[in-house]
């Protein structure tokens, strides 16, 4: 979906969701440092948000790949923790390899992985899915109908999977909302992000679609990904035995997903302020108003 909101409006929307987000204990104040290199000696493991930290859209952020290589040379544990739901882990691996990063397949955890884990024991049968036509869903347990390809199926499916906003239109969104008002059904949310930073701005993401449905149809989606435990539990399971959570750092550009979720998972957190969503808002005022405080604010990794 095309962006029609200003950064201030996006921030306000995140703030209206605070009542349904986890409520961890945050640091009382943050420490401002220039780059991740200034504090990397304090940590054994690093969890990286992708969009806004490693890349903007299809472009790698300058020097990000070099930082990853440096941390690897220091024998640090590394993992991407991303709210990417529309592609498989293999596709994410191929994307970041192409962008110049040397993450292994096992060093990537996505909200789709958290969703797939849930569906192992809760099959989604006859679910309508929001995703580009041709999206592969082989890793997800259930039967799915693509609502872009078959919009008339909205009234007949038994549930909705909000997987991607790509190719989803405002008209389709309104039709879906009206269908859910008439016939309420369960909703699975594969990506809680409201927006994603791109090369030339932001795109509206499935989290925004879920917020509209919550407001108008009064159906709360079951969400997978940051800031929720389901994705962090998968990432923490990859840590070496005896790795202290207090020596594990979550790095992201969004207070309400990366920082809130990282703190809720018992990790230390660092917000990137020169790239991504944080660079578009008065982040110091936002930290003060929301109380969502990272351990560090860094310019970039």
Name each model feature, range by range.
Residues 84:
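Conserved phosphate/oxyanion-binding catalytic-loop motifs
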Residues 1-76, 90-109, 116, 120-128, ...:
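Asp-based, Mg2+/Mn2+-dependent phosphohydrolase catalytic module
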Residues 87:
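Conserved nucleotide-binding/hydrolysis micro-motifs of P-loop NTPases
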Residues 77-81:
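Short glycine-rich or small-residue beta-strand-to-loop segments that form or flank ligand, phosphate
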């Amino acid at each position: 979906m095309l962006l029609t909101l200003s950064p201030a409006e996006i921030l306000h929307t995140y703030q209206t969701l605070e009542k349904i987000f986890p409520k961890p204990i945050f640091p009382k104040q943050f420490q401002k440092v220039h780059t991740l290199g200034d504090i990397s000696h304090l940590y054994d493991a690093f969890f990286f948000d992708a969009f806004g930290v490693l890349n903007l859209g299809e472009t790698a952020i300058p020097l990000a790949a070099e930082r990853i290589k440096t941390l690897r040379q220091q024998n640090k544990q590394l993992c991407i923790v991303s709210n990417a739901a529309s592609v498989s882990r293999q596709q994410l691996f191929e994307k970041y390899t192409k962008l110049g990063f040397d993450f292994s397949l096992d060093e990537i955890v996505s909200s789709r992985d958290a969703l797939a884990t849930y569906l192992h024991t809760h099959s989604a049968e006859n679910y309508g899915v929001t995703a580009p036509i041709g999206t592969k869903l082989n890793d997800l347990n259930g039967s799915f109908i693509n609502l872009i390809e078959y919009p008339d199926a909205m009234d007949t499916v038994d549930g909705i999977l909000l997987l991607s906003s790509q190719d989803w239109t405002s008209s389709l969104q309104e039709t879906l909302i009206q269908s859910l008002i008439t016939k309420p059904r369960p909703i699975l949310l594969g990506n809680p992000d409201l927006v994603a930073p791109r090369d030339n701005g932001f795109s509206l993401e499935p989290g925004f679609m879920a917020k509209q449905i919550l407001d108008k149809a009064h159906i709360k989606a079951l969400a997978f990904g940051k800031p929720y435990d389901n994705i962090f539990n998968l990432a923490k399971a990859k840590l070496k035995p005896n790795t202290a959570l207090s020596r594990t750092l979550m790095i992201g550009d969004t207070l309400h997903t990366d920082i809130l979720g990282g703190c809720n998972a018992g990790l230390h957190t660092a917000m990137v302020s020169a790239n991504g969503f944080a660079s578009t808002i008065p982040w110091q005022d936002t930290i003060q108003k929301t109380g969502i405080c990272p351990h560090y604010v860094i310019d970039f990794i």
